[in-house]
């Protein structure tokens, strides 16, 4: 007979509150469309979002790996590094932090390499190093690359990515604009092919000097290109800017750059341009 007065025994189960931890570094979220992308898939796709085509920022060495033939790149100018000519407070610590973070001494990597068998001089700016701002060392390395192209009669390919002049170096930073432009004039006089690829962002003193003077100027999709940022311009002129103003596609439509080329097509396009402008 069933005992209605007997108390049933219950076991209290505590709800699971601890969430499963997902290891860091497995995926990234696209800042444009919000798509969650596994890093391995992103690497295979040239660090480009497979859903919306957003181009993630990449380091100088990642770009060299994508662009140059295997084991063909030989760096020069690595010993050049910036100092603190104005004794700007905290600048030396900022440089040390950037060097530890990136493994670079400065914001641009220069060297000789081959692109589908064609030898070129390369200068590739790295936005991870103080936004690749241009100080004395960056200006010196860009000029060194130009001098190497003149010496060896080789095409020069420069990938730009910069927040502009490095404010901690003041007038010494601004002097690099004139310095690099003088070397571009020498390239023109010697008929050395000079190709610029603008990546996000290319702004300030870099956009107003050597970056805007290429024989051919390409840009990555969506790259921000201009001297001052859109917010500063709007505040100055007190007008709303057109949609996409200062983006690569807008500038291509208005004749400022020659073509917008996605990252996966760059090696092929650059190879064709080198062939068309070859002196040999």
Curated annotation (Swiss-Prot):
Q: Where does the CoA carboxyltransferase N-terminal domain lie?
A: 26-280
Q: How is the cofactor bound?
A: Binds 1 zinc ion per subunit.
The UniProt keywords, alphabetically, are: ATP-binding, Cytoplasm, Fatty acid biosynthesis, Fatty acid metabolism, Lipid biosynthesis, Lipid metabolism, Metal-binding, Nucleotide-binding, Transferase, Zinc, Zinc-finger
Electron transport recorded as keyword: no
Location in the cell = Cytoplasm
Q: GO: which molecular function terms?
A: acetyl-CoA carboxylase activity; ATP binding; carboxyl- or carbamoyltransferase activity; zinc ion binding
Q: Which residues does the annotation say bind Zn(2+)?
A: 30, 33, 49, 52
Gene Ontology biological-process annotations: fatty acid biosynthetic process; malonyl-CoA biosynthetic process
Q: In which pathway does it act?
A: Lipid metabolism; malonyl-CoA biosynthesis; malonyl-CoA from acetyl-CoA: step 1/1
InterPro entries, per this entry?
A: AcCoA_carboxyl_beta, Acetyl_CoA_COase_Trfase_b_su, ClpP/crotonase-like_dom_sf, COA_CT_N, Znf-ACC
Q: What is its EC number?
A: 2.1.3.15
Q: Which HAMAP family match?
A: AcetylCoA_CT_beta
Role: Component of the acetyl coenzyme A carboxylase (ACC) complex. Biotin carboxylase (BC) catalyzes the carboxylation of biotin on its carrier protein (BCCP) and then the CO(2) group is transferred by the transcarboxylase to acetyl-CoA to form malonyl-CoA.
Q: Describe the protein's quaternary organization and the partners it interacts with.
A: Acetyl-CoA carboxylase is a heterohexamer composed of biotin carboxyl carrier protein (AccB), biotin carboxylase (AccC) and two subunits each of ACCase subunit alpha (AccA) and ACCase subunit beta (AccD).
Name the chain's protein: Acetyl-coenzyme A carboxylase carboxyl transferase subunit beta
> To which species is this protein native?
Carboxydothermus hydrogenoformans (strain ATCC BAA-161 / DSM 6008 / Z-2901)
What's the name of its gene?
Answer: accD
């Amino acid at each position: 007979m069933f005992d209605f007065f007997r108390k049933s025994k219950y076991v209290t189960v505590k709800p699971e509150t601890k969430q499963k931890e997902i290891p860091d570094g497995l995926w990234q979220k696209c800042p444009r469309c919000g798509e969650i992308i596994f890093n391995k898939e992103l690497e295979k796709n040239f660090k480009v979002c497979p859903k919306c085509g957003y181009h993630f920022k990449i380091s100088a060495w990642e770009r060299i790996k994508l662009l140059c033939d295997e084991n063909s790149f030989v760096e020069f100018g690595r010993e050049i590094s910036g100092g603190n000519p104005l004794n700007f407070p905290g600048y030396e610590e900022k440089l040390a932090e950037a060097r530890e973070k990136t493994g670079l001494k400065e914001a641009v990597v220069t060297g000789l390499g081959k692109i589908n068998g064609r030898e070129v001089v390369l200068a590739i700016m790295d936005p991870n190093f103080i936004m690749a701002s241009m100080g004395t060392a960056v200006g010196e390395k860009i000029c060194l690359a130009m001098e190497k192209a003149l010496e060896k009669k080789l095409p020069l390919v420069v990938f730009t990515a910069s927040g502009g002049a490095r404010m901690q170096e003041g007038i010494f930073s601004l002097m690099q604009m004139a310095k690099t432009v003088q070397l571009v004039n020498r390239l023109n006089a010697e008929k050395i092919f000079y190709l610029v690829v603008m990546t996000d962002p290319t702004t300030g003193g870099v956009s107003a000097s050597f970056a805007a003077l290429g024989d051919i100027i390409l840009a990555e999709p969506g790259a921000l290109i201009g001297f001052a940022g859109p917010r500063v311009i709007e505040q100055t002129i007190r007008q709303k800017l057109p949609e996409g103003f200062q983006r690569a596609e807008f500038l291509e439509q208005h004749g400022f750059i020659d073509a917008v080329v996605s990252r996966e097509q760059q090696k092929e396009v650059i190879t064709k341009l080198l062939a068309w402008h070859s002196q040999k």
